């Protein structure tokens, strides 16, 4: 399981990007992959843990949880 920092997240559009600790490229994150109750959003610079899958346009975070 990878860890990283939320680069940005737009709650209105429901997506953003995470910068993994062990990679140069950012990873797309969709609100549906955030594993929290209630309103699913991420704060900028929040520490997260996630799996990396392959989306239609590149790497995508799955199973995202706050660290």
From Swiss-Prot:
This is Cold shock protein. SMART domains: CSP. The keyword Iron does not apply. InterPro entries: Cold_shock_CspA, Cold_shock_domain, CSD, CSD_CS, CSP_DNA-bd, NA-bd_OB-fold. It comes from Arthrobacter globiformis. CDD domains: CSP_CDS. One of its GO terms (cellular component) is cytoplasm. Disulfide bonds: none annotated. Residues 4-64 form the CSD domain. SUPFAM superfamilies: Nucleic acid-binding proteins (SSF50249). Keywords: Activator, Cytoplasm, DNA-binding, Stress response, Transcription, Transcription regulation. It is found in: Cytoplasm. The lineage of its organism: Bacteria, Bacillati, Actinomycetota, Actinomycetes, Micrococcales. GO terms for molecular function: DNA binding. Its main location: cytoplasm. Induction: In response to low temperature.
């Amino acid at each position: 399981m990878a860890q990283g920092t939320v680069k940005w997240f737009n709650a209105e559009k429901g997506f953003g990007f995470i910068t993994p600790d062990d990679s140069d490229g950012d990873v797309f994150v969709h609100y549906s992959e955030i594993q929290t109750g209630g309103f699913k959003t991420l704060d900028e610079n929040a520490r997260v843990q996630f799996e990396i899958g392959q989306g239609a346009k590149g790497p995508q975070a799955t199973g995202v949880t706050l660290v």
